Amino acid sequence: MYAVFQSGGKQHRVSEGQTVRLEKLDIATGETIEFAEVLMIANGEEVKIGVPFVDGGVIKAEVVAHGRGEKVKIVKFRRRKHYRKQQGHRQWFTDVKITGISA
């Protein structure tokens, strides 16, 4: 059984027991969260596709950890003009473990 849900402007395909990395959520570590924006649920041959969301579809997950991703360097450069700018960015994320999928 797997499902596709929407969080942080992105779509994620998950199954029970899987850990997935999402955009930062303001929820403490160890707490439970429910995602109601379920786009699709598949259980063997039975497939439910939402218009746009599945009625009564809920994905339950537990927040495992918060953190920051790898550093991305941004460079702005003009040749022969002695001009260079550098900037770094580390995106915040939340790791959640999927505990249940229901329709």
Curated annotation (Swiss-Prot):
Name a GO molecular-function annotation: structural constituent of ribosome
Q: Which UniProt keywords apply?
A: Ribonucleoprotein, Ribosomal protein, RNA-binding, rRNA-binding
Among InterPro entries, the record links this protein to: bL21-like, bL21-like_sf, Ribosomal_bL21, Ribosomal_bL21_CS
Which residue ranges does UniProt annotate as crossing the membrane? none
Q: Where is the signal peptide?
A: none
Q: What does the entry give for GO biological process?
A: translation
Q: What superkingdom heads the lineage?
A: Bacteria
PROSITE patterns associated with the record? RIBOSOMAL_L21
What's in the GO CC field?
A: cytoplasm; ribonucleoprotein complex; ribosome
Asked whether the UniProt record includes Ribonucleoprotein among its keywords, one would answer yes
The family assignment reads: Belongs to the bacterial ribosomal protein bL21 family.
The protein's matches in PANTHER family, at most eight in alphabetical order, are given as: 50S RIBOSOMAL PROTEIN L21 (PTHR21349), LARGE RIBOSOMAL SUBUNIT PROTEIN BL21M (PTHR21349:SF0)
Write out the function statement from the record: This protein binds to 23S rRNA in the presence of protein L20.
- Self-association or partners: how does it assemble? Part of the 50S ribosomal subunit. Contacts protein L20.
Q: What is this protein called?
A: Large ribosomal subunit protein bL21
* Native organism: Salmonella typhimurium (strain LT2 / SGSC1412 / ATCC 700720)
